[in-house]
């Protein structure tokens, strides 16, 4: 696959000779033919491939997550020696990584489940890397990982030891969930600016370009400004001819499922997963649009003022999403005994990965100041933003509701913020109801 090829080329570019193997002989030959003069050495049997490596062997697996990973590991095992290291760089479900780590360590092998973010380009030029597994095995591969990782502005490589067994893949899963949330928040901002102000694509590009110079500076805002003005071969704006059905690979779903297992209110990211699901009901939505009534969007008033409100709402929404995501990391760390370092995790997201953003430094700073902080919203910087920006978020959500513009993640952000700051919630009534019909008992205040 492209990710595997690009990681191999990245490693080779740092002065290493890389043995390569693919089940398909043609694919192996293709990679070698496309990269003449590179220190890539092809092998056509698993045995020859494994025997070409110096011990302890460091084998990077890049295969489709699931049964394919197990069969690849099974094919390697007969030729491995005790202490050899297998690194799984796929988008693997963390529970599978926990299982594989346990099974392989019982046989004397090391297994490092590694999240890799940055897409195909990141794999080649420097991704963000999230390794989890045996600490001593990580130390043996750390020099290579540090050389191939993205480098943040302060010169630090975007890789750090995450924790035992499935910790690396868990952090990658939450990273992907946060990515879903970021993308949906941006999509809702776009919808509001189009629906409320009727901005042209050029105006949208200018707006996002301005936003990218400030607090919202990030990879996703940066690419979005370019997307607005991209045209197809007929000269039409590409974004306007793309069908409004967002696909997904299931990693956002895993994050939400884990939040339910841990009892964590990951509402914003979960709404972003649901938003993709409802977008895929295109036929039903078109039919429903002819039957179900609602308000037509009215102009949102002063242009500059509304743009600034949406910008503030977007930034505060993003903060709520990360607060929920990092709160879930804390719950998972407690549940699985990982001892995660949240400030370091935010640090390795600063370059190479899809969610890279200027404000991640603020998260690192918050944890440096108070490693035990229960929720990022309580950190002084984020509390100040919430104080200053919540009215904009409330105004934008109110406008959207009054004008029939769906804003599931903006709405989730304000609902979570108000629930989290509520000393008293109406859950007492729910407890009374539960006790009434099921003798579930209750606690008195």
UniProtKB/Swiss-Prot annotation:
<feature type="binding site">
    <location>
        <begin position="22"/>
        <end position="24"/>
    </location>
    <ligand>
        <name>NADP(+)</name>
    </ligand>
</feature>
<dbReference type="InterPro" id="IPR006183">
    <property type="entry name" value="Pgluconate_DH"/>
</dbReference>
<dbReference type="InterPro" id="IPR006114">
    <property type="entry name" value="6PGDH_C"/>
</dbReference>
<comment type="function">
    <text>Catalyzes the oxidative decarboxylation of 6-phosphogluconate to ribulose 5-phosphate and CO(2), with concomitant reduction of NADP to NADPH.</text>
</comment>
<feature type="binding site">
    <location>
        <position position="91"/>
    </location>
    <ligand>
        <name>NADP(+)</name>
    </ligand>
</feature>
<feature type="binding site">
    <location>
        <begin position="1"/>
        <end position="4"/>
    </location>
    <ligand>
        <name>NADP(+)</name>
    </ligand>
</feature>
<keyword id="KW-0560">Oxidoreductase</keyword>
<feature type="binding site" description="in other chain">
    <location>
        <position position="276"/>
    </location>
    <ligand>
        <name>substrate</name>
    </ligand>
</feature>
<feature type="binding site">
    <location>
        <begin position="63"/>
        <end position="65"/>
    </location>
    <ligand>
        <name>NADP(+)</name>
    </ligand>
</feature>
<dbReference type="GO" id="GO:0050661">
    <property type="term" value="F:NADP binding"/>
</dbReference>
<feature type="binding site">
    <location>
        <position position="434"/>
    </location>
    <ligand>
        <name>substrate</name>
    </ligand>
</feature>
<feature type="binding site" description="in other chain">
    <location>
        <begin position="175"/>
        <end position="176"/>
    </location>
    <ligand>
        <name>substrate</name>
    </ligand>
</feature>
<dbReference type="InterPro" id="IPR013328">
    <property type="entry name" value="6PGD_dom2"/>
</dbReference>
<dbReference type="InterPro" id="IPR006184">
    <property type="entry name" value="6PGdom_BS"/>
</dbReference>
<dbReference type="InterPro" id="IPR006115">
    <property type="entry name" value="6PGDH_NADP-bd"/>
</dbReference>
<keyword id="KW-0311">Gluconate utilization</keyword>
<dbReference type="InterPro" id="IPR008927">
    <property type="entry name" value="6-PGluconate_DH-like_C_sf"/>
</dbReference>
<dbReference type="InterPro" id="IPR036291">
    <property type="entry name" value="NAD(P)-bd_dom_sf"/>
</dbReference>
<feature type="active site" description="Proton acceptor">
    <location>
        <position position="172"/>
    </location>
</feature>
<feature type="binding site" description="in other chain">
    <location>
        <begin position="117"/>
        <end position="119"/>
    </location>
    <ligand>
        <name>substrate</name>
    </ligand>
</feature>
<feature type="binding site">
    <location>
        <position position="440"/>
    </location>
    <ligand>
        <name>substrate</name>
    </ligand>
</feature>
<comment type="subunit">
    <text>Homodimer.</text>
</comment>
<dbReference type="Pfam" id="PF03446">
    <property type="entry name" value="NAD_binding_2"/>
</dbReference>
<dbReference type="GO" id="GO:0016054">
    <property type="term" value="P:organic acid catabolic process"/>
</dbReference>
<dbReference type="GO" id="GO:0004616">
    <property type="term" value="F:phosphogluconate dehydrogenase (decarboxylating) activity"/>
</dbReference>
<dbReference type="GO" id="GO:0006098">
    <property type="term" value="P:pentose-phosphate shunt"/>
</dbReference>
<keyword id="KW-0521">NADP</keyword>
<comment type="pathway">
    <text>Carbohydrate degradation; pentose phosphate pathway; D-ribulose 5-phosphate from D-glucose 6-phosphate (oxidative stage): step 3/3.</text>
</comment>
<dbReference type="Pfam" id="PF00393">
    <property type="entry name" value="6PGD"/>
</dbReference>
<dbReference type="InterPro" id="IPR006113">
    <property type="entry name" value="6PGDH_Gnd/GntZ"/>
</dbReference>
<keyword id="KW-0570">Pentose shunt</keyword>
<feature type="binding site" description="in other chain">
    <location>
        <position position="249"/>
    </location>
    <ligand>
        <name>substrate</name>
    </ligand>
</feature>
<dbReference type="GO" id="GO:0019521">
    <property type="term" value="P:D-gluconate metabolic process"/>
</dbReference>
<feature type="binding site" description="in other chain">
    <location>
        <position position="180"/>
    </location>
    <ligand>
        <name>substrate</name>
    </ligand>
</feature>
<comment type="similarity">
    <text>Belongs to the 6-phosphogluconate dehydrogenase family.</text>
</comment>
<feature type="active site" description="Proton donor">
    <location>
        <position position="179"/>
    </location>
</feature>
<protein>
    <recommendedName>
        <fullName>6-phosphogluconate dehydrogenase, decarboxylating</fullName>
        <ecNumber>1.1.1.44</ecNumber>
    </recommendedName>
</protein>
<feature type="binding site" description="in other chain">
    <location>
        <position position="91"/>
    </location>
    <ligand>
        <name>substrate</name>
    </ligand>
</feature>
């Amino acid at each position: 696959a492209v990710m595997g090829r690009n990681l191999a080329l990245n490693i080779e570019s740092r002065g290493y000779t890389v043995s390569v193997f693919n089940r398909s002989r043609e694919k192996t030959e293709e990679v070698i033919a496309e990269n003449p003069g590179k220190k890539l050495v092809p092998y056509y049997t698993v045995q020859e491939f494994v025997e070409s490596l110096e011990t302890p062997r460091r084998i990077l697996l890049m295969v489709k997550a699931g049964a394919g990973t197990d069969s690849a590991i099974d094919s390697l095992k007969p030729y491995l020696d005790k202490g050899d290291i297998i690194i799984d760089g796929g988008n693997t479900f963390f529970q599978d990584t926990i299982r594989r780590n346990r099974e392989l360590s019982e046989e004397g092998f090391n297994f490092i489940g590694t999240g890799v973010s940055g897409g195909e380009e990141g794999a080649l030029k420097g991704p963000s890397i999230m390794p989890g597994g045996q600490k001593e095995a990580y130390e043996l591969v750390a020099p290579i990982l540090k050389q191939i990782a993205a480098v943040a502005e302060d010169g630090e490589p975007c890789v750090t030891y995450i924790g035992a067994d499935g910790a690396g893949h868990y952090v990658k899963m939450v990273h992907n969930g946060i990515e879903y949330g970021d993308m949906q928040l941006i999509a809702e901002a776009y919808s509001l600016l189009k629906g409320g102000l009727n901005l042209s694509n050029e105006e949208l590009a200018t707006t996002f370009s301005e936003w990218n110079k400030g607090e919202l500076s990030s990879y996703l805002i940066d690419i979005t400004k370019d997307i607005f003005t991209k045209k197809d071969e007929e000269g039409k704006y590409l974004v306007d001819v793309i069908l409004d059905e967002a696909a997904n690979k299931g990693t956002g779903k895993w994050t939400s499922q884990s939040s339910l297992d841990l009892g964590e209110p990951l509402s914003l990211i979960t709404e972003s997963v649901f938003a993709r699901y409802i977008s895929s009901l295109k036929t039903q939505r078109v039919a429903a649009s002819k039957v179900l009534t609602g308000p037509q969007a009215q102009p949102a008033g002063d242009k500059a003022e509304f743009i600034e409100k949406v910008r503030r709402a977007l930034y505060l929404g993003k903060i709520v999403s990360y607060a929920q995501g990092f709160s879930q990391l804390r719950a998972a760390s407690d549940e699985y005994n990982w001892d995660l370092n949240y400030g370091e995790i935010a640090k390795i997201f600063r370059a190479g990965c899809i969610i890279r953003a200027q404000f991640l430094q603020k998260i690192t700073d918050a944890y440096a100041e108070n490693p035990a902080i229960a929720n990022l919203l309580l950190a002084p910087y984020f509390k100040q933003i919430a104080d200053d920006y919540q009215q904009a978020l409330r105004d934008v959500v109110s406008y959207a509701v009054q004008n029939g513009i769906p804003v599931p993640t903006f709405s989730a952000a304000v609902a979570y913020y108000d629930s989290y700051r509520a000393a008293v919630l109406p859950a007492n009534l729910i407890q009374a109801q539960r006790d009434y019909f099921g003798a579930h008992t209750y606690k008195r205040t």
